[in-house]
Amino acid sequence: MEEEPWSRATLRVWAGEMTVAQIGAALKIGAERSDRLWCVDAGGGDLHLDDLLKRVEALLTEHREALVQVAARCDVDLFVSWSPKPGQDSVCLGPGLIELLGELGAHVVMDTLTD
């Protein structure tokens, strides 16, 4: 039985000069937390990865000012994970998303799962 494709896009902020609680208070976005990591998931399930990345771009745009301030004190990355289609698959990072991530000094971490 073939598994359904899945995807996930998560904006992550690593506690550095700020605690995870301080990061959450500064960003005012409901998110998952651990001792060293604050993260917000753009969704998943049946959404296509391109749609998830558009959600991330909208989130970055909406909270840009606060994210820039936090990114000056903490490492930020975008964790992108998906099961690619058999053969060949692609991911599109649009210019707006790239510009916003660049402004934060954020890395993009790509994680794929294949059989």
Give residue spans per PLM region.
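Acidic (Asp/Glu-rich) sequence patches and key acidic residues
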Residues: 1-115
